[in-house]
UniProtKB/Swiss-Prot annotation:
Protein name per the record: Small ribosomal subunit protein uS11
NCBIfam families (alphabetical): PRK05309.1, uS11_bact
Bias (Basic residues): 8-21
Tagged with keyword RNA-binding: yes
Length: 137
């Protein structure tokens, strides 16, 4: 017998619970910039995500996700969502080697968020995993 699943999309006529507006004046912006995508998450001081956006979420596909312009739009989108929750000041944590790092920080400032400390938290291996092989074009 098939059992009813919990969660999922609400059925027609059912009321959905509206996500409550948090009032967080100070937060942290985590920018993860890889070679393929850029993800911007804005969290409260405890680390709970308030707003997020990524290059793919904004509407880019394929190799265009890795461009600085896509990172700029993702950061603006996340900043706009976070400002609805009352975020005014953020500390920025940047991770990864991607091309959208600086652009994302600049667009957070341009969107109206006050940027405090900027720190690079890219993980450095102490000779851990073998890196991918060199590309030969």
């Amino acid at each position: 017998m098939a059992q009813a699943k919990k969660g999922g999309a609400p059925k027609k006529g059912q009321k959905t619970r509206r996500r409550e507006k948090k009032n967080v004046p100070h937060g942290a912006a985590h920018i993860k910039s890889t070679f393929n995508n850029t993800i911007v998450s804005i969290t409260d001081p405890q680390g709970n995500v308030i707003a997020w956006a990524s290059s793919g979420h904004v509407g880019f596909k394929g190799s265009r996700k890795s461009t600085p312009f896509a990172a700029q739009l993702a950061a603006e989108n996340a900043a706009r969502k976070a400002q609805e929750h009352g975020v005014k000041k953020v500390d920025v944590f940047v991770k990864g080697p991607g091309s959208g790092r600086e652009t994302a920080i600049r667009s957070l400032q341009a969107a109206g968020l006050e940027v405090g400390a900027i720190s690079d938290v890219t993980p450095q291996p102490h000779n851990g995993c073998r890196p991918p092989k060199r590309r030969r074009v």
